[in-house]
């Protein structure tokens, strides 16, 4: 693994240059097959390789279908400042506030991002979970210790601009010292 990880990071740097400290990999995406591998050991090796290549590396991890497991989070070995979990489908299926997911709320106190997935496979359609977006972002902003931002994770983004506008409008306020409140979508 070490040989290929080093080669991967070197090739990425050669192609893209020094453009980021964020790296995404999902060794057990959508369940995967762990075989006889320990998810904690795999997680530790993945992060070790990233940090060997880039001391400021941040591993971007998707929260989706059982990932990240408690073992994967435990494998970070206390280096959670080098991880960022994307709560991939938070507007419909939140995981940040589920204490049974990943071994504890907020992914065992790992920095995370509230994400709106909304679109699967680039399918066209005007649909979405507006009420969930409005209440979910406010709930996360007001009740989370580890929330670091909001984002979008669609499989196709050239549709339904209303939802994207709404998501990013939910965190906009003129006075950052005030408690975030829900947007009245009837007035919006």
Go through each PLM region and give its residues.
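Catalytic-core regions of glycoside hydrolase
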Residues: 1-188
């Amino acid at each position: 693994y070490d040989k290929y990880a080093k080669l991967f990071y070197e090739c990425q740097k050669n192609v893209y240059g020094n453009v980021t400290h964020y790296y995404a990999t999902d060794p057990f995406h959508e369940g995967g097959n762990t075989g006889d591998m320990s998810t904690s050991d795999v997680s530790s090796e993945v992060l070790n390789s990233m940090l060997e290549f880039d001391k400021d590396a941040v591993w971007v991890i998707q929260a989706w279908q059982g990932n990240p497991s408690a073992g994967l989070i435990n494998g970070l070995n206390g280096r959670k400042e080098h991880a960022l979990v994307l709560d991939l489908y938070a507007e419909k299926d939140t995981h940040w506030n589920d204490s049974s997911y990943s071994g504890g709320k907020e992914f065992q106190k790992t920095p995370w991002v509230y994400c709106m997935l909304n679109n699967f496979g680039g399918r066209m359609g005007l649909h979405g979970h507006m009420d969930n977006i409005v209440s979910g972002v406010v709930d996360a902003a007001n009740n989370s210790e580890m929330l670091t931002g909001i984002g979008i994770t669609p499989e196709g983004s050239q549709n339904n601009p209303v939802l994207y506008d709404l998501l990013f409008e939910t965190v906009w306020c003129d006075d950052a010292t005030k408690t975030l409140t829900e947007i009245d979508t009837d007035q919006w």
